Amino acid sequence: MTLRMPLKSLLVLGLLASASVLAADTAKAPAAPVPLLWKVSDKDNAVYLLGSFHLLRPGDYPLSPEVEAAFADAERLMFELAPEEMQSPAMPQMMLQAALRTDGSTLQQELDAATWRRLEGWAGKNGMPVVSFNNFEPWFVGLTISIVEMTRQGLDPKLGLDNHFMDKAKAAGKPTAGLERAQEQIGVLDGMEATEQRQFIVEALDQAEKGSAETERLHQAWRRGDAEGLWSGMAADMKRQYPRLYRRINVERNDAWVPRIQQ
């Protein structure tokens, strides 16, 4: 595929995973990660595509020379969200506002008894009263579970690959842009049908219960640039168990991004 773009671009795209990454053994410094990096080019233009984890740890840096070389060669960077939106203090408030239930019902009334019990158990393990989730939509609670699991194991969004390259682009004076707006990204989650939202919270609980071995495997696959390992350990399960949710989060968003990349 030839992309007609006037500039060499680096696209930093996140891997959608409701999984956490373990802190590595610090006794031996690991080799620099070689994440998912592709180059698409013709005689005039080039696009680098880089797969990202949104939360990382200090041991994941520095990146491999190939990634740093792609950044140096790129004249502009594109992210899922533009830096001014992703790093805006208004972003969490926008998400919180969208997540509030407005029909007078509670989350407990919406979830089946088995899922509520699982949520109650997870909340208890993390020192949270489960009733604190009652005023929110399932998608927001599922996202909260994923983020808590990540940060509980030492991950830091400030160290995520997106923020890393946003900061580097700003320091280097390179233009940046987003493939979608914050409202669009929130709308993907908030616009899910009730069945999809309940699946989202179950998927988050499933990942939380799989524990450290699964998340370490995914992290190592990312560090190796192992696309097949990430697919089989993450996307394939979602596609098989929750096909409509998979289509909404992965397929439809990717389809919407392609014309913006080609511009």
Predicted regions and their residues:
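Structured, acidic catalytic/metal-binding patches in enzyme active sites
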Residues: 34-249
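Alpha-helical scaffolding within the catalytic cores
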Residues: 32-35, 257-259
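Generic detector of isolated residues embedded in canonical secondary-structure elements
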Residues: 20-22, 168, 260
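N-terminal secretory signal peptides that target proteins for export/translocation
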Residues: 1-5
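A cross-kingdom marker for long, charged
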Residues: 244-263
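Boundary at the C-terminal end of the N-terminal hydrophobic targeting segment
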Residues: 21-25, 31
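Bacterial N-terminal signal peptides
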Residues: 6-20
